[in-house]
Amino acid sequence: MDEYDIVVIGGGPVGLFGTFYAGLRDMKTLLIDAQDELGGQLVSLYPEKIVYDVGGLAGIQAYELAQRLIEQAKMFGPDIKVNELADMIEKTNDNMWIVKTDKATYKTKTIFIAAGIGKIVPSRLGAKGEIEYENRGVYYTVRRKKDFEGKRVLIVGGGDSAVDWALTLAPVAKSVTLIHRRDQFRAHERSVKELFRVANVYVWHELKEVKGDGNKVTQAIIFDNRTKEEKVLDVDSVIISIGYKGDLGNIPKWGVTMKGRDIVVNGRMETNLPGVYAGGDIVQMEGSPKLALIAVGFAHAAIAISVAKKYVEPNASLFAGHSSEMDKFKPK
């Protein structure tokens, strides 16, 4: 059985930075992620959106940010497992931890849980034809803008993501239509105002059925939820943007103290389990407001790894020093 100083659970920004920082502290590291691609929400939800709230970057495409984080995480040669779900953790008699996944079992001295909202699962409407044409015209996010060039696009939803996708695709699509089941939007006012300028908008409307020729989407049937009157729209793509569900799997059964969906940690990012730490969107820090920001998660990761290093090696310094002064970063 492979043995590690630390196992990082979650391959989003916080887990990736934690993996880098563990390598920086000379810890033998394993990173496990349930998705088939590292990067978390940056890659799976909004790869082409611009992220502005990471220090030192005035604006960077989410996918590019993810690639930089992945490159950084790999600097010290960690083991990385993707498409592998951490299923259970167990304490051993020799004060170690066993991490069981759906594919293997690992032994580690410490664990850093950076699972975000969990495995990302799109919310589905349940409309007729939705599942049949999934990934053949029915989508739940926009991975690449160019896939919708010249297409007649129908977007379902009334939140920031739905409105943002409409604004993003309007310049390249043949047409963009957005339907929302209410007349109030959960999006920025300026964006909603622009939406009505660049797209066809139907409020009080819902999706009833997606139709196609067996290979691709050709039409969508929508209806007014007040009058029940139906309309048939000729479309090439349907984007259902009504949110995502985070599947935490068995994490609530691991024995960590939780508050709702959050793992409770102290200022040292320690859970109630010795040697188990957590950070990022999945935590609620005692006495601190919860801010779902990448920048906050980076700080969580640095603190958690530093405390874990001292747990593994009690004589180690809590502070690693400034990277600009480390020999490992100096030109050879």
Curated annotation (Swiss-Prot):
It catalyses: 2 reduced [2Fe-2S]-[ferredoxin] + NADP(+) + H(+) = 2 oxidized [2Fe-2S]-[ferredoxin] + NADPH. Binds 1 FAD per subunit. Keywords: FAD, Flavoprotein, NADP, Oxidoreductase. One of its GO terms (biological process) is cell redox homeostasis. Its EC number is 1.18.1.2. It is an enzyme of class 1 (oxidoreductase). FAD binds at D33, Q41, Y46, A86, I120, D281, S324. It comes from the Archaea. Its cofactor is FAD. InterPro entries: FAD/NAD-bd_sf, FAD/NAD-binding_dom, Fd--NADP_Rdtase_type_2, Ferredoxin-NADP_redctase_2. The keyword Flavoprotein applies. The keyword ATP-binding does not apply. One of its GO terms (molecular function) is ferredoxin-NADP+ reductase activity. Belongs to the ferredoxin--NADP reductase type 2 family. HAMAP family: FENR2 (MF_01685). Homodimer. This is Ferredoxin--NADP reductase. It comes from Saccharolobus solfataricus (strain ATCC 35092 / DSM 1617 / JCM 11322 / P2) (Sulfolobus solfataricus).
